[in-house]
Every structure is written in C-alpha cells, then in structure tokens.
Amino acid sequence: MALLAEHLLKPLPADKQIETGPFLEAVSHLPPFFDCLGSPVFTPIKADISGNITKIKAVYDTNPAKFRTLQNILEVEKEMYGAEWPKVGATLALMWLKRGLRFIQVFLQSICDGERDENHPNLIRVNATKAYEMALKKYHGWIVQKIFQAALYAAPYKSDFLKALSKGQNVTEEECLEKIRLFLVNYTATIDVIYEMYTQMNAELNYKV
C-alpha cells in the first residue's frame, strides 16, 4: 500500500479550487500503479496518464500564478483558444487524465467494497472490468476495447496485486484495504470535482480513440 499511502491528495478547500502544483505532484506518483496489474496491456493507460501529466505541467510551468488552480487552466485556455477550445492544450490533457484517474478510483473502490466473482474470489477481473466500463470503455473504439478485454482476463490475483501495491511489505489484506480507503477519501473527492468542472464549463468531449 506504500505506493498510494506515501502520496495522499490534499483535502479540498471550501471553494473546491484544486491547486495545480500539489495536484500534479501527487498524481505523478500514480502511473506505477499499473505495473501492479501485471499485464503489459495496461501500459497504454499508464503512458497516457504520464503523458497528460507532462502536458499539463508544461502549461502550468509557463505561468504558475496564472494557472494556480485547475479551474484557472480551463478558464484561461477557453479565453486563449476561442473556438478551438476544449480540444486543445492542458484542457484536453486534463480531460483524458481524469478518465485514467477515475479508472484507478473505481477499481480500488470496488475492491474495498468486496465486489468479486464468488466462483473465483481471489481474481480482480470483476473489479478491473467495472473500472474500465465506467471510466474508459465509451471513449475507446472496437479494436481498443477488445485489447483491454483481453487484458482484463490477464489481471493478477487480488493477493498478488495487494502485495505489489504494498511494495512487498508484510501487511495483512485488511491493513492494506484500510490504507486504500484512506487514500480514496481525498482522491475521490478531487476526481469528482474535476468531472463537475468539465460538466459545468461544457468542456467534456465524447470522441473515441
């Protein structure tokens, strides 16, 4: 669980403004999460998350004061790009990033909630399938969907996944799940606010890749 516990997201302030710098720092440690899933087929999601973090950081670094919050990024780029927005810049990168982050959130929440295949309780296929269908499937074309369906069948045992997530530390399953629940508190709240922001600003795009 060390992978998640070491980099908790900050609690949201009352105005729900998400500071760009601390957000990027926290999520930059998440791509190795996909290594814990064992299958190289998850590598594209890992690469997508890393690439989009890099794109957002490049914009942020040009003017940290101007882009202090994620909300600032969308507002400034909407003014800057006009009719091209939201298909450009950090706005587009954050749109895809939030989907990868949602995959992680739904997957971990499903495991914490005890959702499983009763015939194969130590498999995490049910959890990974739910996460993919809720976070990413609708944005993928038929070929990409088939690739990921194959990957889901190659997902590791839950015990092996939790051990990888704990970086080999000798902790019980319940201790690991408790730390995941702690991680999810601020993480889920943050992802929800980003989704709300895209809805409110009409910045969500539904094209497939």
UniProtKB/Swiss-Prot annotation:
Residue positions binding beta-D-galactosyl-(1->4)-beta-D-glucosyl-(1<->1)-N-[(9Z)-octadecenoyl]-sphing-4-enine: 48-55, 140, 207
Name of the gene: GLTP
Record PANTHER family: GLYCOLIPID TRANSFER PROTEIN, GLYCOLIPID TRANSFER PROTEIN-RELATED
Organism of origin: Homo sapiens (Human)
InterPro entries named in the record: GLTP_sf, Glycolipid_transfer_prot_dom
Function: Accelerates the intermembrane transfer of various glycolipids. Catalyzes the transfer of various glycosphingolipids between membranes but does not catalyze the transfer of phospholipids. May be involved in the intracellular translocation of glucosylceramides.
Gene3D superfamilies per the UniProt record, alphabetical: Glycolipid transfer protein
Record text on subunit structure and interactions: Monomer.
Top-rank lineage group of the source organism: Eukaryota
GO MF, any single term: glycolipid binding
Sequence repeat spans: 45-55, 56-66
Protein name stated in the entry: Glycolipid transfer protein
Known tissue expression: Detected in fibroblasts (at protein level). Detected in fibroblasts and in various cancer cell lines.
